[in-house]
Amino acid sequence: MHRRDVLKLGAAATVAAALNPKVLTGESVIPSTEAGDVEQWGLYEIALKGPSTGNPFRDVTLSAQFTQAHRTVEVKGFYDGDGTYRIRFMPDSTGPWSYKTTSSAAELNGRTGRFTCFQPKPGNHGPVTTAHQFHFEHADGTPYFPFGTTTYALFFTSDENAANSLAGMTGKFNKTRACVLPKPLGQGEQMLPFPTLGTPDATGKANDYTRFNPEYFQRLEKRLLQLQAAGIEADCILFHPYDAWGYKAMPNDVDDFYLRYTIARLAAFRNVWWSIANEYDLVRAKTMSDWDHFFRVVQTEDPYSHLRSIHHSRIIYDHSKAWCTHASLQSYDFEKSAERRLAWNKPIIYDEIQYEGDVERRWGNLSAEEMTRRFWLAIIDGSYASHGEVFISADSGPHAHESSWSDAGRLRGDSAPRIKFLHDLVARSTNVGLNEFDGSYYLSAGTPNQLYLWYFDYHRPARYEFPLPNTANFEATLVDPFEMTEKKLPATFSGKSRIDLPNKPYQAIVFRKVSDLVGKPTGKAPTPEIPD
């Protein structure tokens, strides 16, 4: 059984009422901006009526120049069907803006307008970017630590499945990976991004690659807004090898046509990331130069420079290339993080570290304990990780033939709250992220002279002498990652400090600086930890 066969969607489970989306219509999913105002990093949309004859997707060009003072941002528009054209803009600074359209269609050309951008509302920190070399933050400087999950079919699954998935993610994960192009769901006929001219064969010859199905993208946009409202970033996978309609082997000009249309529609959503592909090296019809080209197209077409990466199966992409903002890896060899940072000089997210679940294949039956452990190993090595889950569905009962979580279904495993526990620990401990301490006897990370986090993995020492700086006092907290408990130790510690430990595996301890030592340092000076 292959992963693409296991991760199929079955019947939906109960709808989470609070997240039940509205019935899809042909109207824009974007809240009206006709009042003339939009928040910083919000989405301002211009809707115009224009030609509907011929093929507006290819025949009509449309863009707008958004100007504030001496600065102008060029943004491309798109055709949304039924004679409607849209231009979407994400303003990154407050104050007055004006715009003027440019189009090959006379009725769309030279349209002008003004609006005001006001301060962002609570919870809106702007798009995520890289920061502090190996970490991330929002545009307003708010720290962002990616603790993500995987819901491949979220953008094109049923509303019921999407509601279950959103309910499971909310409050637990702050990023999800989802495919823009569909994969087979095993539920009969699916809505598709391109019209068809009959039944497509493996090469996609029956697809009408000259136009798009706007309803497909409108549903996707609705899901993006739902994620945004829940504080979840959307890592949008642009290509993948799992389709049944020939999209993985489209002609080169169609690839570019699809990318430009998708970016014109989605780039103004502040929570968008671009994943050029999932398991790019399994898309046999594309070459490495094709993938480089796709990166350049995305980089050129996206006026906001959202994060960009690419995910692999066996052949790791060269993430040192300038158009790649961070590394997205399918691996769990976290011990190589240091050499990868040295080679790429960029943040690393281990986006696929296998799956918690119970399926036959080795990649899909991790215990919750092992999934939790792998997140700790990623963090302690100065990197990040993403969760995935795939359980066998029941043949009968209330959840018969339900979707797996990683194809946007119900969250069933036990690792998610433990991952959230780690996320909270990191967020309370640092504003910039944890950096690995090279040469530490036991795995450790933190900020020199401020924060020290040790993780003992499968070791279970009864005590250990920690080499803390002797120029400051530190408070210590014992952490049980799976039980999700913290025990603050009495007193403070400085210099070489021997501490009794729980004598059980997979434990951690965190030291936080509470004060500088005034005058002569006390305690033994720290010395390098001696290897065996």
Each model region followed by its residue ranges:
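N-terminal export signals
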Residues: 5-24
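C-terminal segment of N-terminal export signals and the immediately downstream linker at the start
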Residues: 20-36
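Surface-exposed beta-strand/loop patches in extracellular or lumenal glycoproteins
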Residues: 43-56, 459-470
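Extended acidic/polar, glycine-enriched regions
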Residues: 75-131
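Exposed aromatic-hydrophobic patches
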Residues: 86-89, 496-502
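Active-site mouth of glycoside hydrolases
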Residues: 122-336
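Catalytic-core region of carbohydrate-active enzymes that cleave or remodel glycosidic bonds
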Residues: 321-395
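Aromatic- and carboxylate-lined catalytic core of secreted/periplasmic carbohydrate-active enzymes
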Residues: 357-358, 371-488, 503-532
